[in-house]
UniProtKB/Swiss-Prot annotation:
Alphabetically ordered keywords of this record: DNA-directed RNA polymerase, Nucleotidyltransferase, Transcription, Transferase
InterPro entries: DNA-dir_RNA_pol_insert, DNA-dir_RNA_pol_RpoA/D/Rpb3, DNA-dir_RpoA, RBP11-like, RNAP_asu_C, RNApol_insert_sf
Subunit structure, interactors included: Homodimer. The RNAP catalytic core consists of 2 alpha, 1 beta, 1 beta' and 1 omega subunit. When a sigma factor is associated with the core the holoenzyme is formed, which can initiate transcription.
One example GO MF annotation: DNA binding
Broadest EC class assigned to this enzyme: transferase
GO biological process terms on file: DNA-templated transcription
Catalytic activity: RNA(n) + a ribonucleoside 5'-triphosphate = RNA(n+1) + diphosphate
Protein encoded by which gene: rpoA
UniProt name for this protein: DNA-directed RNA polymerase subunit alpha
UniProt EC number: 2.7.7.6
Taxonomic source organism: Legionella pneumophila (strain Paris)
Functional summary from the UniProt entry: DNA-dependent RNA polymerase catalyzes the transcription of DNA into RNA using the four ribonucleoside triphosphates as substrates.
Pfam families, alphabetized: RNA_pol_A_bac (PF01000), RNA_pol_A_CTD (PF03118), RNA_pol_L (PF01193)
Similarity remark: Belongs to the RNA polymerase alpha chain family.
Region (Alpha N-terminal domain (alpha-NTD)) location: 1-237
Length: 330
């Protein structure tokens, strides 16, 4: 029987059993009875609804004004084309938005690998069939790719650019899509044993992604999102005892935390510290181009940093007035 919360068991074993680069089974044990379902359900919901990623959100097709059109020489109608585009797994490594093109003449089979990329994009499933063209078929498309979180609903989703609302225009076909790179998640809770105790939980999470992120990274990001949402409860205070607290409260508490809390890889963390980036507030004020000038910090590390910041609703290039607070580090 416990008398203090720090006497409760915490997980000691974390196993990652990779079935493929994009499919894995994560095992966490031992957990106090009931915590398997508590953590498993929370992580599953976050993985399915709140993961950052990239997707095609708009298509402009030559000769097509609306999604109920057909294209001469193309076996699929426009609705089917848009459905196929939703399945393209595309990764943005630079920026939050990009335009790519697709230009093909028949007879041929058009695949995701035929999409003409610019700098900073990668197609993970180039074998995906988008359309089939006969000898009269011609397909010219301009596609808009965006980064985001969760599900993109064209009816309810309104983007703001320079304080102007981006409205749907004729010829630009909006695509309902999910930014989440996670395709399937399931969790199971089994019994675990530690010495004479047999009433413990073992949590197993089975996870499959679309390939733009590996399963282990997806679990790490989802846990970081959950941690951030619970942070307010951990640091809950009812009275301000110091005048410095007012200055600190002008900033999001996350910005005042060490970059170590981002749980970056050792390489990325060391690169940031070498540039005297010790707090998250220091990091978010840097731009992508500034970080890429950092010795030993490449595009892979930059993408990792952007994904972790996005999971906390932060981004690079932010402007923070009166940073740093005088009391930072006390």
């Amino acid at each position: 029987m416990y008398t203090e919360i720090n006497e409760m068991l915490t997980p000691k074993v974390l196993k990652v059993q990779a079935e493929s680069p994009y499919k894995a089974r994560i095992v966490l044990e031992p957990l106090e009875r009931g915590f398997g379902h508590t953590l498993g359900n929370a992580l599953r919901r976050i993985l399915l609804s709140s993961m950052p990623g990239s997707a095609i959100t708009e298509a402009s097709i030559d000769g097509v004004l609306h999604e109920y059109s057909t294209i001469e020489g193309v076996q699929e109608d426009v609705v089917d084309l848009l459905l196929n585009l939703k399945s393209v797994a595309i990764k943005l490594t630079v920026g939050n938005e990009a335009q790519v093109t697709l230009n093909k003449e028949g007879p041929c089979q058009v695949t995701a690998g035929d999409i003409q990329l610019t700098h900073g994009q990668e197609i993970i499933n180039p074998e995906l069939v988008i359309a089939n063209l006969n000898e009269k078929g011609k397909l010219n498309m301009t596609l808009k790719v965006e980064r985001g979180i969760g599900f993109h609903n064209t009816d309810a989703f309104v983007r703001y650019h320079d304080d102007e609302i981006e409205k749907k225009t004729v010829g630009k076909l909006k695509i309902d899509n999910s930014f989440s790179p996670v395709k399937k998640v399931a969790y199971f809770v089994d019994s675990a044993r530690v010495e004479n105790r047999t009433d413990l939980d073992k949590l197993t999470i089975e996870l499959e992604t679309n390939g733009t992120i590996d399963a282990e990274e997806a679990i790490r990001i989802s846990a970081s999102i959950l941690q951030r949402q619970l942070h307010a409860f951990v640091d809950m205070k009812f009275e301000e005892s110091r005048a410095d607290n007012k200055e600190r409260n002008d900033f999001d508490p996350v910005l005042l935390r060490s970059v170590d809390d981002l749980e970056l890889t050792v390489r990325s963390a060391n690169c940031l510290k070498a540039e005297n980036i010790h707090y998250i507030g220091d990091l978010v004020q840097r731009t992508e181009s500034e970080l890429l000038k950092t010795p030993n910090l490449g595009k892979k590390s930059l993408t990792e940093i952007k994904d972790v910041l996005a999971s906390r609703s932060l981004s690079l290039g932010m402007k923070l007035e009166n940073w740093p607070p005088a009391s930072l580090g006390e």
